Every structure is written in C-alpha cells, then in structure tokens.
Amino acid sequence: TTNYILTRMIRAGLSFAAALKEAQENGYAEQDPTADIEGHDACRKICILASLAFGRHVYPDQVPTQGITGVTLADVAYAESCGKKIKLLGRAIHRPDGRVCAFVAPHLVDLEDPLSGVEDVFNAITVRGNAIGDVMFYGRGAGKLPTASAVVADVIDAAKHMKTKKYLGWGPGGAEVAVPPAEVESV
C-alpha cells in the first residue's frame, strides 16, 4: 500500500491524500488505512521476521515506528534532487552484543539500490547473509489476489501441521532485545 502511494506521488505528482484515495479506489488500501500508512503493518511484519531470523521475541511496542503520512511532494522533490527515492522501510539488525535493533520509518534510498525499483503494489525483503551478501525477495504485496493467496497458503500450512506436537508461542520476554530509539544508529 505504501509503495503504491509513494509511487503515485513520485510518478504522477499526486498529493499524499490523492494517492491514498486512488489506492483505496483500486482496492490496494483499506477504507481505514491507518495500519498501513502509519507503519503499523510494516512494524508487525518486521517483528515477525526479526523474531524468526534472530530467535528473539521482538514486539511492536519495542519498535520505533513512523509511517508515511507526513511525506509531502516537497519531500519527494528533495529526494529526487539528491538522486534518491523515499521508501517506507522496516529494518532489523542483529547487533554484535546480541541485541536486535528494529525500526520502521521513511528512508531516502539511493537509485542504485535495488529497493528503489520496488514500486506500485510490489514489496521486497532484503536479507544479508555472512556468506552470500544481500539477497532480495520481491513480489506483489497489495491487492485482493496476493492477500487471498497468502491467506490460503497459511490455512494449508496450518492444516498440514495440525497433528504435530510443536507449538510456537509468544511467551514473556523481549524487553532486553530491542534497542531504544536513542540507540538506533545510521545503517
């Protein structure tokens, strides 16, 4: 949803409000788009991904989150003048001290960065590995068909594993994992 809105602001010069309205009319944004445009959906996703990647519970209330509602056409023009695009990014970093730094916010992304080419209804995840470097997974992320596909895949996965005795739960903990906003470093 946010990629679609930002793409329409960049390519068509639409205001945030006009791009959001268009996204809603096309079925890419909910009637109440708060979770998407305020970054809450991205925050939940980065919590899940960070927890899976780093084996630590990361909770939404531990992740500094800022959405795109404050992004203006002047911001878009400034980014373009610097050879960059504005993207809403969720980031999770496993620090050498074992803590996880996670945050969600609009970022200026270099045009040479593959993430700058992720536009419209597409999403991407970049994973950095010690041996392989950066790997980007890219695909549709907004609209009824990608959403329906993800839900069906989750239902099938749950049905396949109904008889297993392995349970994944969100127990207590996590407070020592996330880095407070004052400690977030530039990456």
Regions from the language model: what does each represent?
Residues 1, 42, 147-150:
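Catalytic-loop motifs flanking and including active-site residues across diverse enzymes
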Residues 1-3, 20-22, 26, 164, ...:
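Internal, active-site/partner-interface "lid" segment
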Residues 2-13, 44-58, 154:
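Oxidoreductase and adenylate-handling cofactor-binding alpha/beta cores
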Residues 6-10, 75, 139, 149:
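Short acidic, glycine/serine/threonine-rich loops at helix termini
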Residues 18-117, 122-124:
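Substrate-binding/catalytic subdomain of NAD(P)-dependent oxidoreductase enzymes
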Residues 129, 135-137, 158:
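C-terminal transmembrane helices and immediately adjacent loops/tails
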Residues 133-135, 139-145:
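Glycine-rich phosphate/pyrophosphate-binding beta-alpha loops
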Residues 150, 155-187:
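A conserved regulatory-domain signal marking ACT and ACT-like small-molecule sensing domains
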